[in-house]
């Protein structure tokens, strides 16, 4: 089959069989079977995900990463290859990322067989980008200890940019993503004896109001930060004073100082609840993803490789507010660079955003991705 047939076949198979973070068992088996067919050795440091390696003609070692997990979303695309898993969908394009890396593996194996693979290459089929911090898990598991990786590259499909556009930015290209949760515990009573209880209902209203004001009163208005409330609940019945409350959301910032401000304000809010309502309140923060930092030292190589892949380069003036665990590679492993590849095509109706039930794209864009990867490989220079 030709390369367009290759990416169409594999991407649509993966699209039909999406799996959630840390449950990508069939996806992992599919990738392993593909690698076995090429007689390529690989490791599985975690229960899901695969790390493959090909030795080249030089001592330099570079890595390419694709995430393989999906999202708990019911697909609404009316296509023959729609998800066969109820309420699970590749709504972030990871099926495309995985497919592009598979084709690149095949190209690299062909080069190795002919004695023309210029560098050593590590292929990272990474699980759990969406919720499990798979990149950090792999690093902590020692998945890369035996590879002297000098640089890590990755891409993400981007329905906000047209086909043929590559979006880049030095330094921060995505925001940090930190989850927070408030837990409230009061004292229940019948609504007729409301004064006998300690209501988490009113206390939760206070928390909601105060969180909503953090961005307005405590953060620089010229910076794009997000303090988002995603879900909240108080009580169980309409005629009782609620004895419990819960609220959760996410924080997106570009620098550690702003994140510290938000965390400190949330801690003060939690402390104020006890004083005002006699309700115990605790706030907890889940380990988040740091900002993705693109190494400026890799910029020239990235731009040249994109242009040679017939992609028009757009230098984004501000970072995306997405969270992305590719950030851990640049933070802990090696200089890294992350590129967004445009997939928007209004004529074909490919216009909906990431994490939506109608996300779709033309597989031909994946050929551009692989050309970009190969250009990087052929012209890589140590930084």
UniProtKB/Swiss-Prot annotation:
Alphabetical UniProt keywords: Hydrolase
Pfam families given in the database record: M20_dimer, Peptidase_M20
Keyword Electron transport set for record: no
Entry EC no(s): 3.-.-.-
Top-rank lineage group of the source organism: Bacteria
Family note: Belongs to the peptidase M20 family.
InterPro entries hit by this protein: Amidohydrolase, Bact_exopeptidase_dim_dom, Peptidase_M20, Peptidase_M20_dimer
PANTHER family in UniProt: METALLOPEPTIDASE, PUTATIVE (AFU_ORTHOLOGUE AFUA_6G09600)-RELATED (PTHR11014:SF63), PEPTIDASE M20 FAMILY MEMBER (PTHR11014)
Broad class of enzyme this protein falls into: hydrolase
GO molecular function, one term: hydrolase activity
Protein's recorded name: Uncharacterized hydrolase SAB1253
Biological source species: Staphylococcus aureus (strain bovine RF122 / ET3-1)
NCBIfam families to which the protein is assigned, alphabetical: amidohydrolases (TIGR01891)
């Amino acid at each position: 089959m030709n390369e367009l047939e290759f990416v169409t076949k594999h991407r649509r198979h993966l699209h039909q069989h999406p799996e959630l973070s840390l449950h990508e068992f069939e996806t992992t088996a599919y990738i392993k079977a593909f690698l076995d067919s090429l007689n390529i050795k690989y490791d599985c440091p975690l229960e899901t995900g695969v790390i493959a390696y090909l030795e080249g003609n030089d001592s330099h070692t570079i890595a390419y990463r694709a995430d393989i997990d999906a999202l708990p979303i019911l697909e609404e695309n009316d296509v023959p290859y729609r998800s066969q898993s109820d309420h699970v969908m590749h709504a972030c394009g990871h099926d495309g990322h995985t497919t592009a890396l598979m084709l690149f593996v095949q190209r690299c194996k062909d080069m190795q067989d002919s004695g023309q693979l210029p560098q050593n290459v590590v292929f990272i089929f990474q699980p759990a980008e969406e919720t499990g911090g798979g990149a950090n898990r792999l690093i902590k598991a020692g998945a890369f200890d035996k590879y002297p990786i000098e640089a890590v590259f990755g891409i993400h499909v981007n329905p906000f940019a047209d086909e043929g556009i590559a979006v880049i930015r030095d330094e921060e290209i995505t925001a940090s993503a930190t989850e927070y949760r408030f837990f409230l515990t009061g004292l229940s009573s019948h609504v007729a004896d409301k004064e006998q209880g300690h209501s988490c209902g009113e206390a939760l209203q206070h928390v909601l109001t105060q969180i909503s004001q953090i961005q307005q009163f405590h953060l620089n208005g010229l910076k794009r930060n997000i303090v988002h409330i995603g879900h909240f609940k108080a009580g169980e019945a309409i005629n009782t004073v609620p004895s419990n409350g819960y609220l959760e959301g996410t924080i997106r910032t570009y620098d550690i100082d702003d994140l510290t401000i938000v965390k400190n304000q949330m801690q003060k809010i939690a402390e104020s609840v006890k004083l005002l309502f006699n309700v115990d309140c605790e706030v907890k923060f889940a380990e988040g993803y740091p900002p993705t930092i693109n190494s400026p030292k890799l910029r020239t190589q990235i731009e040249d490789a994109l242009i040679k892949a017939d992609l028009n380069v757009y230098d984004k003036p501000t970072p995306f507010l997405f969270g992305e665990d590719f950030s851990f590679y640049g933070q802990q492993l090696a200089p890294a660079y992350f590129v967004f590849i445009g997939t928007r095509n209004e004529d074909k109706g490919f216009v909906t955003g990431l994490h939506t039930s109608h996300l779709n794209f033309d597989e031909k864009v994946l050929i551009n991705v692989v050309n970009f990867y190969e250009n990087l490989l052929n012209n890589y220079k140590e930084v």
